[in-house]
């Protein structure tokens, strides 16, 4: 159910874009993201930090898009979010000395420290590359291509990278954890 809720604003954005335009889609994205956040609070009595940050960025960049009637703001939101993700991963590794990936998954998985570090860096690089790809596609290609990339391309890339990360993790699990 939670995964469905995470994708709901994206589905709403895409549907409103196809039915109306980027501004209606942006308005719908803000509303859908707020509804998911409220539902999460009512249902689970907690809101994940990343969900809250995402909502704030959606509201700010989406609000600017609607107010100025300029789609560049909503296009930048994607890169800003990926930049924040990459920054958090890199800071956790180099400043806090414990990779964020390890903090998130360390209770469920036992991996050698170098594996956590490589996985953390791989995700940081992934987010940086996705952010750069977003900039190129958002500002050099037609809007409809950017919307398709945002909805389908980035989702597919994230799924593929998650699967590859799973394979990498599996290869480094202790024998007793593999069964």
UniProtKB/Swiss-Prot annotation:
Keyword list, A-Z: Cell inner membrane, Cell membrane, Membrane, Transmembrane, Transmembrane helix
Chain segments annotated as transmembrane: 22-42, 50-70, 76-96, 121-141, 149-169
Compartments, record wording: Cell inner membrane
Primary residence: membrane
Zinc among keywords: no
InterPro entries recorded: YciB
Superkingdom classification of source: Bacteria
Disulfide bonds: none
UniProt GO cellular component terms: plasma membrane
Membrane association type: Multi-pass membrane protein
NCBIfam families per record: ispZ, PRK00259.1-2, PRK00259.1-3, PRK00259.1-4
Family: Belongs to the YciB family.
HAMAP family: YciB
Function: Plays a role in cell envelope biogenesis, maintenance of cell envelope integrity and membrane homeostasis.
Name of the protein: Inner membrane-spanning protein YciB
Native source species: Citrobacter koseri (strain ATCC BAA-895 / CDC 4225-83 / SGSC4696)
Originating gene: yciB
């Amino acid at each position: 159910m939670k995964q469905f809720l995470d994708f709901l604003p994206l589905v709403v954005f895409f549907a409103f874009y196809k039915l109306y335009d980027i501004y209606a889609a942006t308005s719908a994205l803000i509303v859908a993201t707020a509804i998911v956040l409220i539902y999460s609070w009512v249902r689970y009595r907690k809101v994940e930090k990343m969900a809250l940050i995402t909502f704030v960025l959606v509201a700010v960049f989406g609000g600017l898009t609607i107010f100025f009637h300029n789609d560049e703001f909503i296009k930048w939101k994607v890169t800003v979010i990926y930049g924040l993700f990459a920054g958090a991963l890199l800071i956790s590794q180099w400043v806090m000395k414990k990779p964020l990936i390890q903090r998130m998954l360390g209770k469920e998985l036992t991996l050698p420290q170098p594996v956590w570090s490589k996985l953390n860096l791989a995700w940081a690089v992934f987010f940086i590359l996705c952010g750069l790809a977003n900039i190129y596609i958002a500002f050099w290609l037609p809007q409809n291509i950017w919307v398709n990339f945002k909805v389908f391309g980035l989702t597919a890339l994230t799924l593929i990278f998650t699967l590859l990360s799973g394979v990498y993790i599996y290869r480094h699990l202790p024998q007793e954890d593999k069964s």
